[in-house]
A protein has these predicted regions:
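DNA major-groove recognition helix of helix-turn-helix
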Residues: 36-37, 65
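A short, Lys/Arg-rich alpha-helix, primarily the initiator
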Residues: 1-21
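Short C-terminal boundary/hinge segments that cap the last helix of small helical domains
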Residues: 55-68
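Short, basic-rich loop-to-helix N-cap that marks the start of a DNA-contacting helix
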Residues: 40-52
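Short alpha-helical DNA-recognition segment
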Residues: 16-34
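Alpha-helical residues within the helix-turn-helix
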Residues: 13, 24, 52
Length: 68
């Protein structure tokens, strides 16, 4: 099973929000943001800060994808 953050990037487009703006609002470092872009693991704390900054639920920014 792997995590996908495609929903996060779609949400940013829908909100017309720049990556730098989210990083500042959620207090997320550039290296952590690149982990998200590359589908790598990040801490739950980071995900919750992003949800708080975007006023959304965690299911709106990520999904679990089963490997076949």
């Amino acid at each position: 099973m792997e995590l996908s953050y495609k929903r996060l990037f779609k949400k940013l487009i829908d909100l017309d929000m720049q990556h730098n703006e989210l990083m500042e609002k959620a207090n997320v470092s550039r290296s952590t943001f690149y982990k998200l872009k590359n589908g790598e693991n990040v801490t739950t704390d980071v995900l919750l800060r992003i949800c708080d900054a975007l006023d959304c639920d965690i299911s709106e920014i990520m999904e679990c994808i089963k490997n076949d």
